[in-house]
From Swiss-Prot:
It comes from Elusimicrobium minutum (strain Pei191). Belongs to the bacterial ribosomal protein bL12 family. GO terms for biological process: translation. GO terms for molecular function: mRNA binding; structural constituent of ribosome. One of its GO terms (cellular component) is cytosolic large ribosomal subunit. The keyword Ribosomal protein applies. Keywords: Ribonucleoprotein, Ribosomal protein. This is Large ribosomal subunit protein bL12. Homodimer. Part of the ribosomal stalk of the 50S ribosomal subunit. Forms a multimeric L10(L12)X complex, where L10 forms an elongated spine to which 2 to 4 L12 dimers bind in a sequential fashion. Binds GTP-bound translation factors.
Length: 126
């Protein structure tokens, strides 16, 4: 039997369908008694904990509630922030708690919170 080069093997694999590749992987696992799964690395498990310790940079600005007597002022501010029409802004305020804006920088989120709070709404940053 002629010995195949790595290049020839790679070319043959490149021409296979996904189903054929799946069958090849199973055959290699059976023949050599190995698993195709990558080994878990202990360092990778520590990375999410370190990421959680970092300060959050993007926030969702959520309108929690609006005082009944200040609802019109809150609707105006929500329209200004979101660019929504009158009906959409009213529906958002009436349906609180609802997210006003998602993935906003911290400074911008704080500014939005200040505006809505001054108008009579209650905002949480998530």
């Amino acid at each position: 039997m002629a010995k195949l080069t790595q290049e020839e093997i790679l070319e043959a694999i490149a021409g296979m369908t996904v189903l054929e590749l799946s069958e090849l992987v199973k055959a290699v696992e059976d023949k050599f008694g190995v698993k195709a799964a990558a080994p878990a690395v202990a360092v990778a498990a520590a990375a999410p904990a370190a990421a959680a310790a970092e300060e959050k940079t993007e926030f969702n600005v959520e309108l929690t509630s609006a005082a009944a007597d200040k609802k019109i002022a809150v609707i105006k501010v929500v329209r200004e922030i979101t660019g929504l029409g009158l009906k959409e802004a009213k529906d958002l305020v009436d349906g609180a708690p609802k997210v006003i804006k998602e993935n906003v920088a911290k400074a911008e989120a704080e500014e939005m919170k200040k505006k809505v709070t001054e108008a009579g709404g209650v905002v949480t940053l998530k």
